[in-house]
Structure formats: C-alpha cells, structure tokens
C-alpha cells in the first residue's frame, strides 16, 4: 500500500522539516518531499502537527509490559515486548538475556532464531549479557553462574552469530580473548560488568570490542587522577556506549559530561525490565530467580541492588532534553541513528530517508506517542 504522512514536523537524519510529507510504499520510505508536491489522490494520514521521526532502537531491553525474556523465554514474550515498545515509539530492540546456565542461553538463541524467521526489523537479534563477567561488578546477575566460556560454548555462539547481535563480556574475563572470533562471526563485543583497570579495558577495545554496556553502571570508575578504570577507557576510546537516562542509574550531570566527550557514540538505552510499560499495580516480579521490587520508578532486589530500569525510550528522550539539556533533534539521534550505526544497520534503519525501512514514531510536543509505523504499516496508539 502507498500513502503519505502529512502535517508533521519531520526529524530526518540531520534536518528538521516542516510542510514536507513522507511517502511510504510497501515497507519502504519512497520519498520525503514538499507536501505541496504530493500527487493527487494519494492516501494521506494527517499527523496534526506532531513530530515524526525514525522509530527508536533500544540496544538493551531485558523485558517490559510485565514480562522478562530470561524468565519467560519464548517467541510470545518477544512479541509482547515489541507491542509494549510501540506504545513508546520504540520500533526495534535487542532482547537482552543475562547470566544463566549454558542450556538456557542455547534456548534463548533458538527462540531468537524462531522469532527472526517470523518477524523482521523489530527484535534485531540477541544481546547476551553475561555470564562472562566480573564477580565484583555482577550487579543483579547471579554469581554462581558467572564463569569463563568453554570451547564448546564459544563454538556454539560463533555458529549462531547470525542471530546474536551483541555480547557483553568483562574486559578481565579470559573470554575476552575470543573477541576476534566473535567479531568474525558477526557478533559485536561490548565491555561491561567489568572491574578492569584502564589498561586492561583498553586492551579489550584493541582486541575488537566496539561497545560498552551501560556506561558508569557495573564498571570500575575513574577513582583518582591515576586510576581511570573502565569508565576512563570508554571515554578515551572511539567506541560506542549505551547510557541509561532515568536519573536513577547515574546522575544527569554525568550524562552531560559523557555527551560532550562521546558525541555521536553515545546511545540511549533503557536496560528496562518487566516494570516498563506495565500496569501501575505491578509491585514486584521475578527476574532470574530473584524477587524484584518496584517503587517510585526504581527496581531493586532484596539487597537494594539496582536490578534494571522501568523507563521507556520516549521517557529517556524527554529526560535527556529536560534534565541534560540535549537538543531534541540530538536526543532523537541518540535513540535511533546512533544505535543503528553501533550495530551496523544504519543502511536500512535509524533515520527518515528515501529507500530505508519505514519504521517510524509519531509523538506530541509533550512526548506522548500517538502512533508508529513498522515495516510500512501504520498503527495508532
């Protein structure tokens, strides 16, 4: 079907357009043209002056809408996550599977493959976060499962690199030495949950790691003028990094500093769990065998350890604009274009451009998402 989205403020890759229209033909953006040049008789959808942008891409999502991928590992769970995401403008995501036994990881890979055979341009492959981490920076991950990789598991993951998009590995875990193998298999290696020194973290990036998982969280900090830790290595390297902009995981001042240093390598992620997009009456849920409590937007376990976020991508953009003072157009790029580049899919997703997949989000000036387009299909919230 061919139609045009009209009467909107269009955020393209680098421009903000008014009095333009986006023509969608099938699943593709056919053109972005002045509205006055639309052909007579084309079907139109009036967006009533609201913002139109490429759909947001969340590179770290454990769960949402009341479900968790680790605890309900199924195609149906991923479908619930996708439908929940659409309500906040997120059209694509990396389902994140955290530290678990090998058989559970293999099951997650199998389910991811089934999902990808059924759906395209939505869940974009698996993010395996652990178990090859640091005990000292485990966060909510279960320490009894944190380990080095076995040769058999390394081969399995490499053989399934077509459905595993990203892996988080601690820089000091010996598993990091297999980075060239993972990269050759098409897997992006991200440094995270790491207590490494600056030097060890830099070595991980030299081995081929190109991303860092939730900057500042579960990684050794800059503790003095001499000890720079993983945070210092990330800020001093030309790698992408995700950052959680909920005001709980890190101070907004840190986000402001990070943005000045990292520029277009800083990607907004949610790291959200079941509470995101769930009914307000949800007070607790199970995550990898632990009871997680929700209070005032904060998710924590019985030891008061932060267990993930309850924020959406749209809320994150709002926070970036209102509390970090990042211009809206740039906060949007941090949520679609830069994540797309980070995982190498910006040739088809991440911006409103001719020839790209029509995955789009429409939201009001007060950050209320009123509709999305996925693979060219319009859906009103």
From Swiss-Prot:
One Pfam family, short name: Amidohydro_1
Cofactor: a divalent metal cation
Record note on cofactor: Binds 1 divalent metal cation per subunit.
Reaction(s) the record says it catalyses: N-acetyl-D-glucosamine 6-phosphate + H2O = D-glucosamine 6-phosphate + acetate
Enzyme Commission no: 3.5.1.25
One GO-annotated biological process of the protein: N-acetylneuraminate catabolic process
Positions bound to a divalent metal cation: 129, 193, 214
Pathway: Amino-sugar metabolism; N-acetylneuraminate degradation; D-fructose 6-phosphate from N-acetylneuraminate: step 4/5
Gene3D superfamilies, alphabetized: Metal-dependent hydrolases (3.20.20.140), Urease, subunit C, domain 1 (2.30.40.10)
Enzyme class: hydrolase
Alphabetical keyword list: Carbohydrate metabolism, Hydrolase, Metal-binding
Catalytic site positions: 271
Positions contributing to substrate binding: 140-141, 217-218, 226, 246-249, 306-308
Subunit structure: Homotetramer.
Job of this protein: Involved in the first committed step in the biosynthesis of amino-sugar-nucleotides. Catalyzes the hydrolysis of the N-acetyl group of N-acetylglucosamine-6-phosphate (GlcNAc-6-P) to yield glucosamine 6-phosphate and acetate.
Similarity field: Belongs to the metallo-dependent hydrolases superfamily. NagA family.
Name of the featured protein: N-acetylglucosamine-6-phosphate deacetylase
Source species: Haemophilus influenzae (strain ATCC 51907 / DSM 11121 / KW20 / Rd)
Gene name of the encoded protein: nagA
């Amino acid at each position: 079907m061919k139609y045009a989205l009209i009467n909107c403020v269009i955020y393209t890759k680098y421009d903000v357009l008014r009095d333009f229209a986006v023509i969608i033909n099938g699943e593709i953006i056919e053109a972005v043209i002045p509205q006055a040049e639309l052909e007579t008789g084309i079907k139109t959808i009036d967006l009533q002056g609201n913002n139109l942008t490429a759909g947001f891409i969340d590179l770290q999502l454990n769960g949402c809408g009341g479900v968790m991928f680790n605890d309900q590992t199924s195609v149906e769970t991923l479908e619930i996550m996708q439908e929940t995401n659409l309500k906040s403008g997120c059209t694509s995501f990396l389902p994140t599977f955290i530290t678990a036994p090998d058989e559970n990881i293999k099951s997650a890979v199998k389910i991811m493959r089934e999902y990808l055979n059924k759906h395209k341009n939505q869940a974009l492959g698996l993010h395996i976060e652990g178990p090859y981490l640091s005990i000292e920076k485990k966060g909510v991950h279960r320490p009894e499962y944190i380990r080095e990789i076995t040769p058999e598991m390394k081969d399995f993951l490499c053989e399934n690199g077509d459905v595993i998009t990203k892996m988080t590995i601690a820089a000091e875990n010996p598993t990091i030495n297999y980075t060239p193998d993972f990269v050759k298999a098409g897997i992006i290696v991200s440094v995270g949950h790491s207590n490494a020194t600056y030097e060890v973290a830099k070595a991980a990036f030299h081995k081929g790691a190109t991303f860092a998982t939730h900057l500042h969280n579960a990684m050794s900090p800059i503790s003095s003028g001499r000890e720079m830790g993983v945070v210092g290595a990330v800020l001093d390297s030309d790698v992408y990094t995700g950052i959680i902009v909920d005001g709980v995981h890190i101070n907004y001042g840190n986000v402001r500093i990070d943005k000045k240093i990292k520029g277009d390598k800083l990607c907004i992620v949610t790291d959200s769990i079941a509470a995101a997009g769930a009914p307000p009456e949800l007070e607790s849920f199970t995550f990898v065998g632990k009871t997680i409590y929700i209070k005032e937007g904060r998710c924590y376990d019985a030891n008061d350890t932060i267990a993930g976020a309850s924020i959406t991508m749209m809320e994150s953009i709002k926070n970036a604009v209102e509390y970090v003072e990042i211009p809206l157009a740039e906060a949007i790029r941090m949520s679609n274009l830069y994540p797309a580049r980070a995982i190498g899919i910006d040739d088809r997703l991440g911006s409103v451009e001719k020839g790209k997949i029509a995955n789009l989000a429409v939201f009001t000036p007060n950050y209320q998402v009123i509709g999305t387009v996925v693979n060219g299909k319009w859906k009103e919230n």
